[in-house]
């Protein structure tokens, strides 16, 4: 016991290092939990609009929105192709495949969901001739809406 006491007095940085590593683990756990909850909130919002969670484009859209909502990417500093590339890297896919999958998910939702539901969750103006918002407009408007809630 005395030997341990002498060692602890001689090496107080060991105890401090242990406390710091415990704090870092707690912060990491808290951040992971926050990220999980944020992703769930985004997916719930998309599903309420009519997006299907089983569609790959919806999951990619969730990741793109997460990057913007969590602050990992800034809306005013990031162009849309950088977001596709970041998600493509995370999901082992090309940015063009990410873009196309998101486009298909948006088109499918706009085709199958009720207009009243879409207007409730996406109250922004879009080109009526096209019948849906562009990927860029949708992503930036929804991320702004989610961040403000």
List each language-model region with its residue ranges.
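Short alpha-helix boundary/capping motifs
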Residues: 10, 115-116, 133-134
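C-terminal output/effector regions of signal-responsive regulators
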Residues: 26-121, 125-129
């Amino acid at each position: 016991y005395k030997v341990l006491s002498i060692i602890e007095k001689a090496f107080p940085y060991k105890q401090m290092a242990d406390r710091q590593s415990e704090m870092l683990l707690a912060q990491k756990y808290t951040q992971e939990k926050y990220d999980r909850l944020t992703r769930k909130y985004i997916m719930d919002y998309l599903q309420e609009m009519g997006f299907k969670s089983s569609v790959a484009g919806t999951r990619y859209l969730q990741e793109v929105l997460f990057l913007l909502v969590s602050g990992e990417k800034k809306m005013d500093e990031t162009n849309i192709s950088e977001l596709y590339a970041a998600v493509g890297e995370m999901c082992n896919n090309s940015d063009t495949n990410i873009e196309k999958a998101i486009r298909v998910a948006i088109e499918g939702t706009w085709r199958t969901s009720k207009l009243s539901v879409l207007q409730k969750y996406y109250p922004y103006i879009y080109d009526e001739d096209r019948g849906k918002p562009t990927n860029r407009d949708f992503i930036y408007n929804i991320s702004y809406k989610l961040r403000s809630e």
